[in-house]
Design a protein with these regions (language model features):
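Outer membrane beta-barrel translocator domains of Type V secretion systems
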Residues: 590-743
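Bacterial Sec-dependent N-terminal signal peptides
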Residues: 1-17, 23
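Intrinsically disordered, low-complexity Ser/Thr- and acidic-rich flexible linkers and loops
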Residues: 68-76, 171-180, 469-476
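Sec/Tat signal peptide C-region and signal peptidase I cleavage site
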Residues: 26-30
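Disulfide-bonded cysteine-rich modules in secreted/extracellular proteins
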Residues: 33-36, 129, 148, 230, ...
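Short, glycine/alanine-rich hydrophobic alpha-helices that insert into or span membranes
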Residues: 17-25, 632-637
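Fold-core signature of tandem repeat domains
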Residues: 41, 46, 52-54, 58-63, ...
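Extracellular beta-solenoid/beta-roll
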Residues: 229, 301-304, 337, 355-381, ...
Length: 743
């Protein structure tokens, strides 16, 4: 009533619509219009601060005014006002427009565009927010509102929204508190459907009941969420928020943050429950294939397929980890009877303790030699003694990793696919260390193995060999000091694995080194080198070269035990791997230059040959043929190349063979007779291409040089009239675009 009074006070009077018939058509409304009870108005537009006050029925109105003071401002007085008993159907609200539905009023099928709004204290059914906003005030009920991109529904305290469909709000990324799109609930929201990109934010005083969240959508809970179903969507429960009865289905994810509480959560196959430090989840039902992600700093109580489990007060008991599940046992905390199945991860920090662990195929263990862990895996019993730093029987796979700290030792370790074994300086190996295909061992210092290393995976020195270095043909930045390391082992059996080593090829002749101490190197191991020196300054090696494999104390290395995994080049040199009679292996520079050197040496000659042929082509056109045309077009092609005249080492042009072709257009500017001589001047332009195959000094193919050329020139032609003698003077400039491709 107060809003109506303000509306009426806006102008001197109110124009009352005539009610001569039950239905009145109003093609153009007056400034203020009242639709009386029992009256129906079809169509019309509200603009320029107009009012329509509806006690009867208004159909098909377009509203473009009313938000003079901004969104959801009680000072707004224009637009369409639906009063107690009033009805509005099929209304369109455009930018700047306002539809106000007071208590007792009802609207249906309203479409609100960006910049428009609906203020609701009555009832609204089938509202569509196409970038527009709906403000549901105390006592208001919004049913089946569809919130599309950039639309926003605010359900205030004492208000209710039912069967809302949310298609916007999450574009800012997971759990981003943007709050200006999607649905914000301060009152009650029932049976909300949240689709991809949709977001529902439940404020501290709000309640959301029976929400369904699909993939790409999420629900942020600061208040209360009841009976939410996550069908691929996410639910974030923040400090002070509670979620009860959540069902997490495939690809769904419930995250309980510090201070958040979840009760009676059910996690089905491929669903995930994450409880952060300080978060609480009680009465959890974890079905087979469901994932639990938590740490011993959280509180989680419930049941899994093996029975009841608990995580509280720094202790975990009976936890099952699979399908992306993870338990972090923190320093000073403990876990017992943990089962780690396929896709599960048990991470034990230094000072943490995990006993009676069962690791099955596909499970991952993450620890270092400062943790205490004992249990069984696919290979049998395993253990880590956090006091002595001794580990035995570890199986690392599927993201599992173990770090041997200084003074620690790992014995009889198996590293499977996607597993990593890291050794600090002073860490050591014993027994059999097996690296499967896809496994990694990282050496951060000098490491000694007193047993055997069997390698089908990757060994990295200081983890400096990256994919970027591989793509750049094993060249790394040389602007930081490098400390080279040694890996010493009794025996090495190569099973097609790779050892990634660092080397300086700019004169220092130093590298990481593999030492075979008293045993054998057998099988096949690839050596991949990263040049950590100045990649533009390759220096020829001296003596035997750079020793990279050192056979000591009677050790032997099979011929073919090592090979380069990729070309190694620096400056002008190629480097090869060679085995000497002392069983050691060395990097040596080749006497021949690397393939790129003859290619670049050939470029200048190729360009000059082309330029000379193009400039000389002028004589054949006019001097010999005596053409009189002022403009001439010619096409020419032929062979281009050089014989072997001693090679680069003797300063000669590399041997090459190829072809050229060009199109030339020239035009005379002046023709005249001077002192018995015919004088002609003109200009020309040409576009051409040449391609030459280049050979190295040893006769092998080095690659191909291709040249796209554009030329401009001028000429002066003199012909002695009586004798026929002639001369051409040519000035020419050419832009060459050359590309060398080595074999």
């Amino acid at each position: 009533a107060s809003e109506l009074a303000r509306s009426r006070g806006k102008r001197a009077g109110v124009a009352v619509a005539l009610s001569l018939a039950a239905v009145t058509s109003v093609p153009a409304l007056a400034a203020d219009t009242v639709v009386q009870a029992g009256e129906t108005v079809n169509g019309g537009t509200l603009t320029n601060h107009d009012n329509q006050i509806v006690f009867g029925t208004a159909n098909g109105m377009t509203i473009s005014t009313g938000l003079e003071y901004g969104p959801d401002n009680e000072a707004n007085t224009g637009g369409q006002w639906i009063q107690n008993g009033g009805i509005a159907n099929n209304t369109t609200v455009t930018g700047g427009g306002l539809q106000r539905v007071n208590a007792g009023g009802s609207v249906s099928d309203t479409v609100i565009s960006a910049g428009g709004g609906q203020s609701l204290q009555g009832q609204a059914v089938n509202t569509t927010l196409n970038g527009g906003e709906q403000w549901v005030h105390e006592g208001g009920i919004a049913t089946v509102t569809v919130i599309n991109e950039k639309g926003w529904q605010a359900v205030k305290s004492g208000a209710m929204a039912t069967d809302t469909v949310v298609n916007t709000g999450a574009e800012g990324g997971p759990d981003a508190e943007n709050g200006d799109t999607g649905q914000n609930v301060y009152g009650d929201a029932v049976r909300t459907t949240i689709n991809k990109n949709g977001r529902q934010i439940v404020a501290a005083e709000g309640t959301a009941n029976t929400t369904v969240v699909y993939a790409g959508g999420d629900q942020t809970v600061h208040g209360h969420a009841l009976d939410t179903t996550l069908n691929g969507g996410y639910q974030y429960v923040h400090n002070g928020g509670t979620a009860s009865g959540t069902v997490v289905n495939s690809d769904g994810w419930q995250i309980i943050k510090e201070g958040g509480l979840a009760d009676f959560t059910t996690v089905n196959q491929k669903g995930k429950l994450q409880v952060n430090a300080g978060g609480t989840a009680t009465h959890v039902t974890l079905k087979q294939g469901g994932a639990l992600v938590t740490s011993t700093a959280a509180t989680v109580l419930g049941s899994n397929r093996l029975g009841n489990f608990t995580v509280e007060n720094g202790k975990a008991d009976g936890v099952v980890l699979e399908s992306g599940g993870r338990l972090d046992v923190l320093e000073g905390h403990s876990a017992q009877k943990t089962r780690v199945d396929d896709g599960g991860t048990l991470a034990v920090s230094a000072g943490g303790k995990a006993t009676d662990v069962t690791m099955t195929s596909g499970g991952a263990l993450i620890a270092d030699s400062g943790a205490t862990v004992e249990g069984t895996n696919a290979s049998g019993k395993f253990s880590i003694d956090g006091i002595s730093g001794q580990a035995s029987g570890l199986l690392l796979e599927n993201g599992g990793s173990f770090t041997v700290n200084a003074g620690g030792q790992a014995g009889n370790t198996t590293v499977g696919h996607r597993g990593t074994l890291t050794l600090a300086a002073g860490g050591s190996l014993s027994g059999r260390t097996q690296l499967s295909k896809g496994a990694s061992m990282v050496l951060n210092g000098d490491v000694v193995s007193t047993g055997d290393i069997v390698n089908a995976g990757e060994i990295h020195f200081d983890n400096q060999t990256t994919q970027d270095a591989v793509l750049s043909r094993a060249v790394a930045k040389g602007d930081s000091p490098v400390t080279f390391h040694k890996l010493t082992t009794t025996n090495l059996t190569g099973q097609g694995g790779t050892i990634n080593m660092r080397v300086r090829l700019d004169g220092s002749n130093t590298s990481d080194q593999l030492v075979i101490n008293g045993g054998q190197a057998t099988g096949k191991t690839w050596l991949a080198f990263t040049n950590v020196g100045n990649s533009n300054l390759g220096v020829a090696t001296t003596g035997q070269g750079i020793r990279v494999v050192d056979a000591q104390n009677g050790a032997t290395t099979e011929e073919g035990a090592f090979a380069l995994s990729r070309p190694l080049q620096a400056g002008a040199f190629n480097y090869t791997l060679n085995r000497d009679s002392d069983e050691d292996w060395y990097l040596r520079s080749e006497n021949a230059y690397r393939a790129e050197v003859p290619l670049y040496a050939s470029m200048l000659t190729q360009a000059m040959d082309y330029d000379r042929i193009l400039a000389g082509s002028r004589s054949h056109q006019t001097g010999v043929n005596g053409e009189n045309n002022s403009v001439r077009l010619s096409i020419q092609g032929g062979h281009l190349g050089h014989d072997n005249n001693g090679g680069i080492a003797r300063g000669a042009t590399p041997e090459s063979s190829g072809s050229y072709g060009f199109v030339r257009l020239e035009g005379d500017l002046l023709r005249t007779e001077v002192a018995g001589m015919s004088l002609t001047t003109g200009v020309y332009g040409a576009a051409g291409h040449s391609s030459v195959d280049v050979k190295d000094d040893d006769g092998s193919r080095a690659g191909t040089v291709r040249d796209d050329a554009g030329s401009l020139g001028g000429y002066l032609n003199l012909v002695h009239t009586s004798s026929g003698l002639w001369a051409d003077i040519v000035a020419q400039g050419t832009r060459h675009s050359m590309k060398a491709s080595s074999d």
